[in-house]
């Protein structure tokens, strides 16, 4: 007879619904002063267990791999209503381990397909204001790494990345990258890189429309930063952006600017070899440009002897045939330049 009264096992959808109810409780509990602490603690402990159980379904555990059908059920229920919004809103009220679990759950759900569709993308398109909340999370020291990781997964969706790039939010990253907290600054830098490299056509469109202010800020705030790590990351990312074929029109304009050339020549003279090497990969684009403006040619000619000497001594720590071939080509290009009359 015992078997007749066994409770039915929870389905993934049940788990999400119960979690949603607990998140609603958590959201309201601060406005319920008469609520006993023991009751609140009990509910929060249950919420932590549920989020951990969702993580186990999505990632599997030491005993079992994730089951596709269970993942699909969980994903469908999660995005059916505002569970993601509730989870993001309530995240500061969760303990550290549960925040980590919740961050992993949100990250995984961005990649889950239901009937061959990424329904997270559809949900975020309809609830795009959630990106505003996640971005502002970078300003909260306790929450920045959790919100930052969620944000980075959300911009895997092109529609979300496009929204961020077209908003004023993108300008905030110039400051976030230089926050005094090293971990948060590094996380912001990783997110900025993802934003500017993942979706090629969206990035090319953004840079074409915004190249004047974007590169002015990039130069002054990042490449000329007093922080060595900021400069090193920025020159590496600049190379990744300009060397991408999708950005060829932007690159051509970038290497026609006297101000950009001046900054690159300063970076070539850095004491840090890693910055020098990364700066070379951008500088070679100026040298290779077959339609150099007269003022670019004249700057290169005026600094020719210094540049030839500096580049001759520049060697990566490991032998690199491609680097040496590029360097030889740049040396030839600079040596062959003739001064030009300014129009």
Swiss-Prot record:
Gene3D superfamilies: Leucine-rich Repeat Variant (1.25.10.10). It holds the Pfam family Mo25. It comes from the Eukaryota. InterPro entries: ARM-like, ARM-type_fold, Mo25. One of its GO terms (cellular component) is plastid. Belongs to the Mo25 family. This is Putative MO25-like protein At5g47540. It comes from Arabidopsis thaliana (Mouse-ear cress).
């Amino acid at each position: 007879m015992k078997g007749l009264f066994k409770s039915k096992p929870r389905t993934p959808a049940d788990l999400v619904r119960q979690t949603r109810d607990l998140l609603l409780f958590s959201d309201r509990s601060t406005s319920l002063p008469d609520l006993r602490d023991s009751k609140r603690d009990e509910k929060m402990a249950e919420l932590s267990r549920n989020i951990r159980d969702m993580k186990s379904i999505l990632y599997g555990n030491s005993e079992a791999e994730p089951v596709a059908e269970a993942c699909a059920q969980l994903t469908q229920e999660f995005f059916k209503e505002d569970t993601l919004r509730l989870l993001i809103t309530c995240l500061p009220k969760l303990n550290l381990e549960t925040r980590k679990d919740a961050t992993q759950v949100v990250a995984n759900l961005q990649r889950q397909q239901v009937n061959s569709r990424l329904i997270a993308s559809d949900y975020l398109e309809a609830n795009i204001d959630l990106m505003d909340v996640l971005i502002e999370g970078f300003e909260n020291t306790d929450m920045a790494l959790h919100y930052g990781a969620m944000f980075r997964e959300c911009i895997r969706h092109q529609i979300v990345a496009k929204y961020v790039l077209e908003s004023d939010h993108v300008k905030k990253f110039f400051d976030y990258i230089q926050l005094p907290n090293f971990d948060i600054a590094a996380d912001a830098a990783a997110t900025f890189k993802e934003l500017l490299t993942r979706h090629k056509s969206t990035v090319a469109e953004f840079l074409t429309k915004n190249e004047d202010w974007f590169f002015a800020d990039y130069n002054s705030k990042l490449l000329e930063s007093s922080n060595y790590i900021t400069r090193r990351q920025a020159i590496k990312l600049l190379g990744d952006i300009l060397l991408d074929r999708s950005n060829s029109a932007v690159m051509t304009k970038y290497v026609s600017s006297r101000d950009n050339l001046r900054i690159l020549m300063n970076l070539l003279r850095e004491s840090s070899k890693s910055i020098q090497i990364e700066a070379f990969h951008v500088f070679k684009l100026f040298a290779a440009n077959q339609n150099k403006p007269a003022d670019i040619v004249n700057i290169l000619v005026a600094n020719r002897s210094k540049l030839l000497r500096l580049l001759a001594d520049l060697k990566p720590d490991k032998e690199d045939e491609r680097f040496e071939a590029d360097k030889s080509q740049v040396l030839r290009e600079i040596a062959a330049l003739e001064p030009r009359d300014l129009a």
